[in-house]
């Protein structure tokens, strides 16, 4: 993680959530924008783009999820996000959370579980002002 990029992202997050009243409605453009910000600052632009991004009215017991299709050639990764979040902070934290799963699947060839690889990002998230939970 580059410190200068991380500081810039931390300032951006603080500014965005300062007057966050909610609910927050998301769309593809905003997802792409925040994906680029987080990928640059936290993952050093290593993450591949999702092959498909779906915005859903509801997900069973989740605020977002990554679907991995490792048997396909090439491997495919899809992101599913909710259309409406309680706050913009919830949206940003959910997207960043799912980006860790993408990192696990695409770069580490990991299971994508909430394991030590997943939680190794907790200090980075804390530095930029985000929480990391299951």
Walk through the language-model features, giving the residues of each.
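Walker B catalytic acidic pair
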Residues: 98
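Active-site-proximal or metal-binding-adjacent scaffold patches in catalytic folds
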Residues: 1-93, 102-134
């Amino acid at each position: 993680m580059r410190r200068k990029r991380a500081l810039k992202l931390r300032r951006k997050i603080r500014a965005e959530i300062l007057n966050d009243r909610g609910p927050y409605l998301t769309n593809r453009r905003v997802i792409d924008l925040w994906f680029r910000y987080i990928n640059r600052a936290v993952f050093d632009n290593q993450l591949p783009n999702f092959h498909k991004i779906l915005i859903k009215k509801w997900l069973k017991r989740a605020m977002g999820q990554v679907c991995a299709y490792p048997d396909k050639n090439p491997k495919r990764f899809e992101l599913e996000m909710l259309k409406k979040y309680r706050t913009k902070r919830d949206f940003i934290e959910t997207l960043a959370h799912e980006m860790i799963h993408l990192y696990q699947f695409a770069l580490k060839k990991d299971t994508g579980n909430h394991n030590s690889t997943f939680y190794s990002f907790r200090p980075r998230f804390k530095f930029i002002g985000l929480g990391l939970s299951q």
